[in-house]
Amino acid sequence: MFPERLDAPQAYDIAKAMMDGFNRHYRLFRAESARAKHRFETADWHGQQRAQRERIEFYDLRVRECVRRLDKEFNAGALPMDVWHQIKLHYIGLMVNHLQPELAETFFNSVTTKILHRTHFHNDFIFVRPAVSTEYIESDDPGARPTYRAYYPSRDNLHETVVRIVEHCALQRDFENLPRDAGHVVQALQQRLGAVKLRTNFQVQVLSSLFFRNKGAYLVGKVINGYNELPFALPILHGEDGRLLIDAVLFGENDLQMLFSFARAYFMVDMEIPSAYVQFLRSLMPRKPRAELYTALGLAKQGKTLFYRDFLHHLRYSTDKFRIAPGIKGMVMLVFDLPSFPYVFKLIKDQFPAPKDTTREQVQGKYLLVKQHDRVGRMADTLEYSLVAFPRERFSDELIEEIRRHAPSQIEISDRDGDGRQEVIIAHLYIERRMIPLNIHLQECFDTGLDKPEARSALEHAVTEYGNAIKDMVAANIFPGDMLWKNFGITRNGKVVFYDYDEIEYLTDCNFRRVPPPRCEEDEVSGEVWWPVGPHDVFPETFGPFLLGNDSVREAFMRHHADLLDVEFWQSHKERIQAGHLYDVFPYDSARRFRCASPSSFQTQGDST
């Protein structure tokens, strides 16, 4: 119950201190995001990567700062609960007319849950449900930039309109030939529109801020004609001579889904009203959850908040039980899922059998490495949670026993909230998008019969994509470590993505070697490794026996990716990275690129990133 009167004098001051903490966080977050434009203009690629990594840490730093301030100035942990009721009410008042209220709610939750006992983690004390609407938020500042701009071209001046749209981005670097690039865009658009009649509402809406990631800047918008909307994005890159060019045009929901994939690094976007950007992006990608859009924009904590709300909603309206995930069980991670929910839940086992030589802390470090690194569309993002409570009745007994056997330190079953309901509390877990494990996908091809063209084509595509995934990770200085098929998954769009991170390494930390010649006949026929192997030694020519036991798989692999078995491939990329050269891995097929220019890039065969 909320109090009828706000009579605690310190309640407003605490609420104001928390809001000050959030405002400081978002001011710094937005400033760092806005600087991405200058880094792009000056081709500061290493600075861009460094900023993308460092910005991930901003949120937790600001939360800790705020907690320290509340403890020091207000002894917040000792306050009675009726004061915390009032603090939340004052905070709601401070969110009225705020431009980022949903982010401010999440910040309040993060601070409060570090101070209060878990029994108070419900809607009386934190924002389990949103308290302030994010619809139709607008800035009243006369100098504020609108969320998006609308343009009203005709067929006759479409070219001039495209030029004007790009010029409004105000990039402080010359284009190679903007009229030429605009011509390519118009030609592609006219091919999509065909002979369709342009209706009276024909317009182009474009988000005001560019989306920056690595070496690319992306202009995102949609074409509206009658009742139809066509999402699009224009990738802007540096050409070989340093001037800018439009590299391609992406059309439709699927292209935009690839651009905003959960397997890519987060964008840097200067947003005053992030909810308005998310609302616009959802009109382009209606199947993409808002949680994933906030995460793609670098607002990962908001993504976690929305994901958890979606998860609780799904639990309320489903009845199936959590189970051990199908597939080959891992030696490091215990994986379970809810069949009706498109995600998997992964927790680290307490002990690892040989030959695994790692620790819980090292595994967590690997997952953090992936979180902070450029995932190039080939490594699944993860949501990390602690002390997550699930209804006991939704867990199968088999799953409970599996967790108790392999990760007893990670599970507690109790009525911690005191409401009479037993809960399964998992101490620490990761959540990832569910994909079909690649080994299962290949087995389905075998079961269908490779004499059938569709099965053979699916196998060829999967094996080709597997090699492409490895090569894209190589381009980003990542060696996957355990390259078995079961550690890769295939998405609904047919992309192959890596998701097992416990053996991942920087490519530059690996020592790529050839297998030495046998010393004697016994060495030659031995099935064992007889030569000395260091902790970071990798022997690419030994990959074949582990990966290519099936003749059809081997044929497809050797046709497209035989170089992965050659030490020279790996060593050359290691040396290239050590020399400071960053390859480009873009989120669209190389066939989509305008052929008038080709900036230096790393394109895998059949690239579909």
Curated annotation (Swiss-Prot):
Main location as per UniProt: cytoplasm
Q: Which GO terms describe its cellular component?
A: cytoplasm
Annotated ATP binding lies at 325-331, 346
Q: What is the official name of this protein in its record?
A: Isocitrate dehydrogenase kinase/phosphatase
Keywords for the protein's UniProt record, in alphabetical order:
ATP-binding, Cytoplasm, Glyoxylate bypass, Hydrolase, Kinase, Nucleotide-binding, Protein phosphatase, Serine/threonine-protein kinase, Transferase, Tricarboxylic acid cycle
Q: What is its EC number?
A: 2.7.11.5, 3.1.3.-
Catalytic residues of the enzyme: 381
| NCBIfam families reported for this sequence | PRK02946.1
